[in-house]
């Protein structure tokens, strides 16, 4: 029996995570938040004082990637991320850990180490995977491929609201600069750069609500699954 796969790719702050969780809940599919994998690995390497010395400690970093124990659960259209059984959902969502993830993602050997971990999420009845290279590198066979984007300014505004909701005091100018820096790094990296798959359904969410984007996605996915 074929496992249905839905991929959602796009830049940081475009709403991928929220919409991936909603789609997984809607269809009763498993969920993969690939960005969380990189954030978790980045945080782990930081704690081990390896993140700033990736080249000389590469074998140890690769082993850490292979051994990561992570689980994703969906609850009320939200994602709960467990690391070694501990809920780290909020911990890994800071801008600092996002920078850790971007550094990890730029290392080909670490991307390779996480490749099979991501492929292992293919399980019946289906999978919703969100990230930056889900359709182009990890799940090219996906039946439904979505590329979700938004202007850097609108993504910065959303991120500020999210962080303020977590009780953090942040400046939109700092968040915008961070987003623009990550976009540049993600788009220019040599391995699996951020770009839409040639057959992806592209959505710009700059002026759309979550519910409006979700409905567009469901309409598209229903057609792909029926086909």
Curated annotation (Swiss-Prot):
One GO molecular-function entry: dCMP kinase activity
UniProt main location, coarse: cytoplasm
One Pfam family recorded for the sequence: Cytidylate_kin
**Catalytic reactions of this protein:** CMP + ATP = CDP + ADP; dCMP + ATP = dCDP + ADP
What keywords does the record list, in alphabetical order?
ATP-binding, Cytoplasm, Kinase, Nucleotide-binding, Transferase
Sites where the protein binds ATP: 10-18
Q: Where in or outside the cell is it found?
A: Cytoplasm
Q: Which domain of life is it from?
A: Bacteria
Query: Per the record, GO CC terms?
Result: cytosol
Record GO biological process: nucleobase-containing small molecule interconversion; pyrimidine nucleotide metabolic process
InterPro entries, alphabetically?
Cytidylate_kin (IPR003136), Cytidylate_kinase_dom (IPR011994), P-loop_NTPase (IPR027417)
* Enzyme Commission designation: 2.7.4.25
- Name the NCBIfam families for this protein: cmk (TIGR00017)
Which family is this protein grouped under? Belongs to the cytidylate kinase family. Type 1 subfamily.
- Which PANTHER family does this entry report, sorted A to Z? CYTIDYLATE KINASE, CYTIDYLATE KINASE/PANTOATE-BETA-ALANINE LIGASE
* Protein name according to UniProt: Cytidylate kinase
Source organism of this protein record:
Acinetobacter baylyi (strain ATCC 33305 / BD413 / ADP1)
């Amino acid at each position: 029996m074929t496992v249905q796969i839905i991929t959602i790719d796009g830049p940081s702050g475009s709403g991928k995570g929220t919409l991936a969780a909603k789609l997984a809940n809607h269809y009763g599919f498993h969920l993969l938040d690939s960005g969380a994998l990189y954030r978790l690995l980045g945080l782990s390497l930081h704690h081990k004082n390896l993140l700033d010395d990736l080249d000389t400690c590469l074998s140890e970093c690769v082993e850490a990637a292979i051994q990561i124990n992570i689980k994703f659960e969906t609850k009320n259209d939200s994602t709960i991320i467990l690391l070694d059984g501990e809920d780290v959902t909020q911990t890994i969502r800071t801008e600092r850990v996002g920078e850790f993830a971007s550094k990890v993602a730029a290392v080909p050997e670490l991307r390779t180490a996480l490749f099979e971990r991501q492929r292992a999420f293919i399980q019946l009845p289906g999978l919703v995977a969100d990230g930056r290279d889900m359709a182009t590198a990890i799940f090219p066979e996906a039946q439904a491929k979505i590329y979700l984007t938004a202007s850097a300014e609108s993504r910065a505004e959303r991120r500020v609201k999210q962080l303020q909701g977590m009780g953090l005091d942040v400046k939109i100018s700092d968040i915008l600069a961070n987003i623009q820096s990550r976009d540049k790094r993600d788009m220019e990296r040599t391995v699996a750069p951020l770009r839409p798959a040639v057959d992806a359904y592209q959505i710009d969410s700059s002026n759309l609500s979550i519910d409006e984007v979700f409905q567009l996605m469901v309409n598209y996915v229903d057609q792909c699954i029926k086909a």
